[in-house]
């Protein structure tokens, strides 16, 4: 199983209410995509730390992740929710199954 997490820095004009909307939209929209096994998203607790918003999604494999990336729901979510509100991102992928060679994730 692949755990994909993206950390985001937000544009200065993004309000706490907008962050709440982003969280709800992520859960409601991205869970419609068949390749998504689970999703978590949230806002930072400590305002002193960078990366005030994150989305984490589990996929069966990197192949499933690639299918997800091309899904029209994901493309629309990126265009309408993420791009207008974020200034920077950091994406990380992790293999969750012990003993599995990451070359075959």
Language-model features: locations:
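Long, contiguous binding/interaction regions
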Residues: 18-23, 75
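Generic structural motif
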Residues: 11-13, 60-62, 97-99
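Glycine-rich beta-strand-turn "strand-cap" elements at beta-sheet edges
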Residues: 40-49, 79-105
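An amphipathic, aromatic/His-enriched active-site/gating alpha helix that lines ligand/cofactor pockets
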Residues: 31-36, 58-92
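Short, conserved charged micro-motifs
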Residues: 14-20, 64-67
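Short, well-ordered beta-strand segments in beta-rich or mixed alpha/beta enzyme
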Residues: 3-9, 42-71
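Generic structural "secondary-structure junction" signal
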Residues: 12, 35, 47, 70, ...
């Amino acid at each position: 199983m692949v755990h994909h997490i993206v950390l985001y820095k937000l544009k200065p004009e993004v309000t706490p209410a907008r962050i709440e909307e982003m969280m709800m939209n992520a859960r409601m929209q991205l869970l419609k995509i068949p390749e998504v096994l689970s999703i978590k998203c949230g806002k930072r607790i400590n305002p002193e730390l960078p990366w005030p918003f994150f989305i984490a999604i589990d996929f069966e494999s990197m192949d499933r992740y690639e299918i997800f990336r091309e899904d029209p729901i994901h493309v629309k979510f990126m265009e309408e929710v993420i791009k207008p509100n974020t200034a920077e991102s950091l994406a990380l992928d992790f293999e969750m199954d012990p003993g599995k060679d990451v070359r075959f994730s």
